[in-house]
From Swiss-Prot:
Residues 2-157 form the N-acetyltransferase domain. This is N-alpha-acetyltransferase 20. One of its GO terms (molecular function) is protein N-terminal-methionine acetyltransferase activity. The gene is naa20. Catalytic subunit of the NatB complex which catalyzes acetylation of the N-terminal methionine residues of peptides beginning with Met-Asp, Met-Glu, Met-Asn and Met-Gln. Proteins with cell cycle functions are overrepresented in the pool of NatB substrates. Required for maintaining the structure and function of actomyosin fibers and for proper cellular migration. InterPro entries: Acyl_CoA_acyltransferase, GNAT_dom, NatB_acetyltransferase_subunit. It comes from the Eukaryota. GO terms for biological process: N-terminal peptidyl-aspartic acid acetylation; N-terminal peptidyl-glutamic acid acetylation; N-terminal peptidyl-glutamine acetylation; N-terminal protein amino acid acetylation. CDD domains: NAT_SF.
Length: 178
C-alpha cells in the first residue's frame, strides 16, 4: 500500500527517479531545504511498500490575508513514470488543498507549461481553471524560445464569492506576478 508522509532530508538523495522527467522543474538542494524548513506540511512524498519514492508535492503558503490573496501554492508536483495514471497526483493535490484550507487560504494556485496538455487536463478535472497566461515563464534550453505558463487556480471554501478565480482578460509577464 502506498504511504503518504512528510518529505524528509533523506528523501533528497532518493528522488532522482522522479525528477528525471523533462517536464519536471528541478532545483538545487538549498531550494528544497528552504521549503522543507519553512513549509514542511506542504512537502509530501508518496512511498511504495518497498520504500521506492513514487512522487512528491512541494508547496507553500503565501499572499496577503487583507487583500484576500492568502493561498496555497504548488511549486512542484511530480510522479515517477512507472507510477502515473494511478491517481497519485490527484491524491497529493488533495492533501495540499486540505492543508491550505486548514491554514485559511482563499485558493490554491500553480503554474504549468501551456504545452503540457496532460497536466492541464488533469488540473481541470481536479477543479482548477486558467486564471491567467504568463508569457515566457519557463526558460528554454538548446536555443528554443521560452515557454508560456498557465497560472491555474482553484477556489477554497473561504472564497465564498469565488473572486480569486475570475480570469484576467490579458496575459502578464513574470515580473508582473506578485
Amino acid at each position: 500500500m502506498t504511504s503518504l508522509r512528510p518529505f524528509t532530508c533523506d528523501d533528497l538523495f532518493r528522488f532522482n527517479n522522479i525528477n528525471l522527467d523533462p517536464l519536471t522543474e528541478t532545483y538545487g538542494i538549498p531550494f528544497y531545504l528552504q521549503y522543507l524548513a519553512h513549509w514542511p506540511e506542504y512537502f509530501i512524498v508518496a512511498e511504495a511498500p518497498g520504500g521506492e519514492l513514487m512522487g512528491y508535492i512541494m508547496g507553500k503558503a503565501e499572499g496577503s490575508v487583507a487583500r484576500e490573496e492568502w493561498h496555497g501554492h504548488v511549486t512542484a508536483l511530480s510522479v515517477a513514470p512507472e507510477f502515473r495514471r494511478l491517481g497519485l497526483a490527484a491524491k497529493l493535490m488533495e492533501l495540499l488543498e486540505e492543508i491550505s484550507e486548514r491554514k485559511g487560504g482563499f485558493f490554491v494556485d500553480l503554474f504549468v507549461r501551456v504545452s503540457n496538455q496532460v497536466a492541464v487536463n488533469m488540473y481541470k478535472q481536479l477543479g482548477y481553471s486558467v486564471y491567467r497566461t504568463v508569457i515566457e515563464y519557463y526558460s528554454a534550453s538548446n536555443g528554443e524560445p521560452d515557454e508560456d505558463a498557465y497560472d491555474m487556480r482553484k477556489a477554497l471554501s473561504r472564497d465564498t464569492e469565488k473572486k480569486s478565480i475570475v480570469p484576467l482578460p490579458h496575459p502578464v509577464r513574470p515580473e508582473d506576478i506578485e
